[in-house]
């Protein structure tokens, strides 16, 4: 089964604008769909809300920066979060530990507990699976060239 072209277009838009302020109202205006319909369609196709998708991608992108010595405020703002508090809360909801603990995990700091280590490992695995699933969804869209039909009455 092919991916929904509208959802693929929305995913591409979100990915291209992931570090900027994104609102459901803005998306519904750009794609000319009712906000409620768009949210239902997105959830039905991907089994995740638009906001959860955006937050997951932002957290995934921020993980790369956590390997550096950049401060957490800079990382949160550069990945589209309004505040360090919202970034930390979202990070903990998705990854299971706060960004500082995850940074220790990335740097193989021995001060993290075994439970934190397991949580970080499992969360990273799940996040990678999610990102790969979305990438496959985007690549599985049926292009317009496949819809070419010839009307036999005009031959």
What kind of region is each of these model predictions?
Residues 24, 30, 35-42, 66-103, ...:
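Sequence-specific DNA-binding recognition helix
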Residues 1-19, 25-41, 145, 150-152:
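An amphipathic alpha-helical interaction segment
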Residues 89-155:
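…primarily DNA-binding HTH/wHTH and HhH modules…
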